Amino acid sequence: MKYENELFILNYTEKDKYYIEDFMNYLNDNSKRIMDFFNLEKLSTKITINLIEKKEEIDKIFTSIHNMPAHDFLIGFAKDSQIYYISFNELNNVPKHQNDIYELYQKTIVHEFVHSCNYEFSPLWIRCLCEGLAVYLSEQRDKNDNAFNITKDELFNGRVNYIQSFLFVKYIIENYDHDFVLNLYKSEKFAKENLDRLYDETVEYYQTKNKVK
């Protein structure tokens, strides 16, 4: 089955039909806010969202595109204008998502849409920045979180840590102007010149904040 509007093409099955209207309303309601962040007036092509019925299927698609195994907790990913996302009917069968509720499911599709807009804005992919931004804009974490406790090497070179990446990006967004933030996502040279310093500032910021508490 298929849903289409000016921004999205959604491919889904009969089993998904009962939640699709609400699902797309939520995504549509958040899309302008996300695009505005990247100063995108429109997208070069519609975003195609493919709802996948089984975890094994989405893992195979991920591996075929990225040439690496999928994490056991993977429920969705974006690649350029394509989003692959687990069906809500299958969500609670995926490790670490057994207790996820529909609200979290909605926020995760917004997370993936952030990635699609990020790809549209710039091909540069700095993982901690891009994942942190997707968590921040999709509102998957409490904005009051403040336990920043990751080493510089782990943040920049280790396995993705969504919470720590979120806290890093949160500090940057709340302490720098928008043009500065966007330059981190657009210019590799600019990012390399600033990331080490930004990490040090972030550590100091959260240490000070926690002492005050």
Question: Where is each model-derived feature located?
Answer:
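Acidic/histidine-rich, surface-exposed loop or edge segments in extracytoplasmic proteins
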Residues: K2-Y19
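Sec-exported extracytoplasmic/periplasmic mature domains
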Residues: M35-N39, V114-P123, S138-K143, I173-D177, ...
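Pan-zinc metallopeptidase signature
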Residues: G158-K213
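Low-complexity, serine/threonine/proline-enriched polar segments
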Residues: Y85-N89
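Auxiliary, metal-adjacent structural segments of Zn-dependent hydrolase domains
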Residues: M24-Q82
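Post-HExxH zinc-binding segment in Zn-dependent metallohydrolases
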Residues: E120-N161, K209
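Active-site recognition of the HExxH zinc-binding catalytic motif
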Residues: E103, K107-E120, E131-V135
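Soluble non-cytosolic domains of exported or imported proteins
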Residues: K17-N28, N99-L104, T108, L124, ...
